[in-house]
């Protein structure tokens, strides 16, 4: 395997499937089975999951909610997703722990960096919920932060598109997909990959990002093996 320790970022929307809201159990199980295959080969894997399938803080703020309050509601939504993923992973035979940045010890461990790393070393998957515990930060930024903290080799952003484009491929059929590009290109071009804080964290800590289509069967395994799928972002192309 090309990567020994991976941070997988899943959007909340990815868990919806074809629904407009909520969680599709079939999608959760499909993701869990793909992860199980990777873990069985010895890769250490942690997951950060978003909450946009249940609540998105920015939308709440735009509707008049206090921004910090809306972000806290969004953080709680990510915990719901994290526990759901844990259930799916355990049914797929993968030992899993959920750690949350906001303590709720009846359902999850508090986030403790050294404990998270120890879980990974023991072959368990760790799902991080609750964002980074502070409002005004996205779950993409949380993914970059946790990747740096656990010394991950790479961040996988598994999404609904097959890579990074120079413009929206849904609106522009002639949009160009990048096979590889630099962090500086993403920041300078304001490309819609992750927010600038998330990109800067990976740039400063020299953690590459691979963006790929989550719904292409076997893509998580291909990405872990270092196959050329999606778009790779790093300090050098």
Swiss-Prot record:
GO molecular function, one term: ATP binding
One GO CC term on file: cytoplasm
Reactions accelerated catalytically: UMP + ATP = UDP + ADP
Pathway this chain belongs to: Pyrimidine metabolism; CTP biosynthesis via de novo pathway; UDP from UMP (UMPK route): step 1/1
Subcellular location: Cytoplasm
Leading EC class: transferase
UniProt keyword annotation of Membrane present: no
Gene3D superfamilies, alphabetized: Acetylglutamate kinase-like
Annotated binding of UMP, by residue: 51, 71, 132-139
Cysteine pairs bridged by disulfides in the record: none
EC number(s) given by UniProt: 2.7.4.22
Ranges in coiled-coil conformation: none
Listed GO biological process terms: 'de novo' CTP biosynthetic process; UDP biosynthetic process
Regulation acting on activity, per entry: Inhibited by UTP.
Main subcellular localisation: cytoplasm
Keyword Kinase: yes
Protein residues bound to ATP: 9-12, 52, 56, 159, 165, 168
Keywords: ATP-binding, Cytoplasm, Kinase, Nucleotide-binding, Pyrimidine biosynthesis, Transferase
Classification via Pfam families: AA_kinase (PF00696)
Self-association state and partner proteins as the record states: Homohexamer.
Family recorded in the similarity comment: Belongs to the UMP kinase family.
Function statement: Catalyzes the reversible phosphorylation of UMP to UDP.
Name used for this protein in its record: Uridylate kinase
Taxonomy of the source species: Bacteria, Bacillati, Cyanobacteriota, Cyanophyceae, Synechococcales
């Amino acid at each position: 395997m090309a990567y020994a320790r991976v941070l997988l970022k899943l959007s909340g929307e990815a868990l919806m499937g074809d629904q407009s809201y909520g969680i599709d159990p079939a999608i959760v199980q499909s993701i869990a089975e793909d992860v199980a295959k990777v873990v069985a080969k010895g890769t250490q894997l942690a997951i950060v999951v978003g909450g946009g399938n249940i609540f998105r803080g920015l939308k709440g703020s735009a509707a008049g909610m206090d921004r910090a309050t809306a972000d806290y509601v969004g953080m709680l939504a990510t915990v719901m997703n994290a526990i759901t993923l844990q259930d799916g992973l355990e049914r797929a035979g993968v030992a899993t722990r959920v750690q949350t940045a906001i303590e709720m010890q009846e359902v999850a461990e508090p986030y403790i960096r050294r404990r998270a790393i120890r879980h990974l070393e023991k072959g368990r998957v760790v799902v991080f919920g609750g964002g980074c515990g502070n409002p005004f930060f996205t779950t993409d930024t949380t993914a970059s932060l946790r990747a740096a903290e656990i010394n991950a080799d790479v961040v996988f952003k598994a999404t609904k598109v097959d890579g990074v484009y120079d413009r929206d491929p849904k609106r522009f059929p002639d949009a160009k997909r990048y096979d590889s590009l630099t962090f500086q290109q993403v920041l300078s071009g304001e490309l819609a990959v992750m927010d600038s804080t998330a990109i800067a964290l990976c740039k400063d800590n020299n953690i590459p990002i691979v963006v790929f289509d989550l719904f292409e069967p076997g893509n998580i395994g291909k990405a872990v093996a270092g196959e050329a799928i999606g778009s790779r972002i790093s300090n050098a192309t």
